[in-house]
UniProtKB/Swiss-Prot annotation:
It is an enzyme of class 3 (hydrolase). Belongs to the glycosyl hydrolase 97 family. Ca(2+) binds at residues 179, 446, 452. Residues 1-30 form the signal peptide. This is Probable retaining alpha-galactosidase. It comes from Streptomyces bingchenggensis (strain BCW-1). Its cofactor is Ca(2+). Keywords: Calcium, Carbohydrate metabolism, Glycosidase, Hydrolase, Metal-binding, Signal. The keyword Ribosomal protein does not apply.
Length: 635
């Protein structure tokens, strides 16, 4: 009897295991032409619907949230030199799993991350027997897919991937440039001008937002841009290279949609969550922080003057800023700008500056042109030398390409700089498509129409937190109070708020010492500024109109707001947590900046007067009797 029970129990267990296996991997039947992939929170998060046309064998992907369409059925597919895998497809199997990860980043809007995504791998065969997998992931804040090609598939000739929006969608787009630096403008998605657009494009339909993004981009592939034809709500994926070379198995980058209400999209870490885990084992040397950036402050003369740089070091030390960034000129021929001195190692004053700065608690980072690091031999000359001198980081400029060859260069420079304990800031570059999870010493990247541009608008400033800065750290370089060309020139409080609003692991402060000393309230605020955050919350905003974000560090919240349009009183709902809080506001007054402390409840709505195209900054801390300031040194 006991033996019979054991046999019966074993048979039941075996049947259960077999049933689970069949559920996971069984080939689809002929009638299976539509499949749904839901995230962990199926009721509130996005849902992906994959459809295989029975007549053409073509694939489409549709995305919805809360029963509303976010993405209309949009074509999928990839073309290789051996096969067109966009038509004539047949499903041969499926596999499902849950992706659950926990990781920490050195910088970003939230350093501790908990990831939970559902993943379905669809296996397809095309005409002639060619094979590929489509991997679809869905989380509470996004949908992503990638193509996985087996070895022998050959080079990639393009994708048929596209994003088709609802006809009533609104778009915020930046025209494509090879350095990803351009203004964001608002259009109806269907009637935006014909052209190419940067891949970080934001769309909104009846209160739900979707941000197109890319993750896990490396030299195995080529970067994407969006190609649009006016009159159609479709944005096609175009690659930098007409042919992407591949001599083995290939996983393409993730094509991602960050989906949700505006707060969900703004606070999302989805592009990092999709990226590979950190490849830097020891991260103890990676330290974010504000930097005094000397280019807008001192221009060409500063880059070639040891005495000027020592002055900047003195000022940074007084402010408690951990870094000074020496920009272009320091290794140029003294008589020829933009020409590398062949004896730069012997002639350089950087070692003296590093010693001077170290004695004052300041680290030195240096600018380098990409052309001086584009070969292995050059990197073997430069990087060990900089490490030996004690330089803390490099700002590498003018890649100006997202080709496969350039991405392969990134694959080489990233482990090399990590090996020599050099923090990295890329300028004239691609944008951080998950790179800061995989390579945590990447503190920030440009890829933005930043402070040095003379054509920015207030609308552009209010769009960046919802587009480019969602993707990863953004070296906008705020704080240039001395520049009359900035769009918020009438609002020093608005300029100050950008230092919080725009996240960057090295927050390069672009003002002159004189401009900070003329604004002691701004100077005091920037002395308190962290560069890495425990969490981020959107308090208020809409792209092109306003943006107010709160970022937490330790027990304090830093708040920054920027607005486009006429002077008004902004109503800002606080999301600081329970209890009573002191909100230490910095506002524009009739004769300059003014400080206005207020005691509020953590869920109150804050009324803030802002000037035209202006803004504000604030620090919030738990209030107790007698507390009048949120400064670190305050009682």
């Amino acid at each position: 009897m006991a033996r019979s029970v054991r046999r019966t129990t074993l048979a039941l267990l075996l049947s259960a295991v077999l049933a689970m296996t069949l559920f996971v991997t069984a080939p689809a039947h002929a009638q299976d032409s539509t499949w749904t992939v839901s995230g962990p929170s199926a009721r509130s998060g996005p849902q992906a619907r994959l459809q295989l046309d029975a007549t053409t064998g073509a694939l489409t992907l549709q995305v919805s949230r809360g029963g509303r369409t976010v993405l209309e059925p949009s074509p999928l597919g990839i073309r290789t030199e051996g096969a067109d895998l966009s038509r004539g497809l047949r499903l041969s199997g499926r596999e499902r799993r849950v992706v659950a990860e926990r990781y920490r980043t050195a910088v970003g809007k939230q350093r501790s991350r908990d990831v939970r995504m559902t993943e379905t791998r669809f296996r397809f065969r095309g005409d002639g027997g060619a094979r590929f997998d489509l991997v679809v992931r869905v989380s509470d804040d996004g949908v992503a897919y990638r193509y996985v090609l087996p070895k022998g598939s050959g080079d990639v000739l393009g994708e048929t991937s596209a994003f088709t929006l609802p006809t009533d969608a609104t778009a915020w787009l930046g025209a494509y440039r090879r350095d990803n630096e351009n203004l964001f403008n608002q259009y109806p998605a269907a009637t935006a001008p014909t052209g190419e657009y940067m891949a970080q494009a934001l769309f909104e339909t009846r209160g739900t937002y979707a941000l197109i993004a890319e993750s896990d981009l490396s030299g195995r592939y080529s970067a994407a841009r969006l190609i649009h034809e006016a009159g159609l709500p479709t944005y096609r994926i175009g690659l930098w290279d007409e042919r992407v070379t591949s001599d083995g198995a290939l996983s393409t980058p993730w094509r991602a949609l960050v989906v949700g209400d505006l707060a969900t999209v703004t606070e999302s870490t989805f592009t990092d969550d999709l990226a590979p885990a950190s490849r830097v084992a020891d991260t103890s040397w990676i330290r974010p922080g504000p930097a005094l950036w000397t280019w807008l402050a001192g221009g060409k003369p500063a880059g070639q003057s040891l005495s000027m740089q020592k002055g900047y070091v003195d000022y940074a030390a007084q402010r408690g800023w951990p870094y000074v960034v020496v920009d272009a000129g320091w290794y140029f021929d003294p008589d020829q700008w933009d020409v590398t001195d062949p004896d730069w190692q012997t002639n350089s004053w950087i070692p003296e500056l590093v010693t001077y700065a170290r004695e004052r608690g300041v680290g030195i980072q240096v600018w380098i042109h990409h052309r001086d690091l584009d070969t292995a031999e050059e990197r073997e000359q430069w990087l060990p030398t900089l490490e030996r001198w004690g330089v803390k980081g490099v700002k590498i400029d003018f890649m100006d390409s997202e080709s496969q060859d350039t991405l392969r260069w990134y694959d080489e420079i990233l482990p090399a700089t990590a090996a020599h304990h050099l923090l990295v800031n890329f300028h004239g570059s691609t944008i951080p498509k998950g790179i800061q999870r995989t390579w945590p010493h990447v503190m920030t990247m440009e890829g933005v129409n930043g402070e040095e541009k003379r054509v920015n608008t207030a609308q552009h400033l209010t769009t960046l937190p919802f587009t480019r800065n969602v993707i990863g750290s953004m070296d906008f370089t705020p704080g240039a109070f001395h520049r009359p060309q900035r769009p918020n020139a009438a609002s020093d409080a608005g300029e100050l708020g950008l230092s919080v609003l725009y996240e960057s692991g090295i927050q390069n402060l672009a003002g002159t010492p004189e401009s900070y000393d003329a604004r002691p309230l701004a100077r005091g605020f920037l002395e308190q500024l962290p560069a890495a955050w425990d969490r981020t919350r959107l308090l208020a905003g809409r792209p092109g109109e306003s943006a107010v974000l709160a970022r937490a560090s330790g027990g304090r919240w830093f708040i920054g707001g920027t607005f486009a349009g006429a002077a008004h009183t902004a109503e800002v709902p606080l999301r600081l947590g329970s209890g009573t809080w002191l909100v230490d506001l910095v506002l524009d007054g009739p004769d300059g900046l003014v400080r206005e402390p207020r005691v509020v409840r953590g869920g109150d709505t804050l009324s803030v007067p802002v000037v035209a195209d202006g803004g504000f900054a604030a620090i919030a801390c738990h209030w107790r009797p007698g507390r009048t300031s949120c400064d670190r040194t305050a009682a």
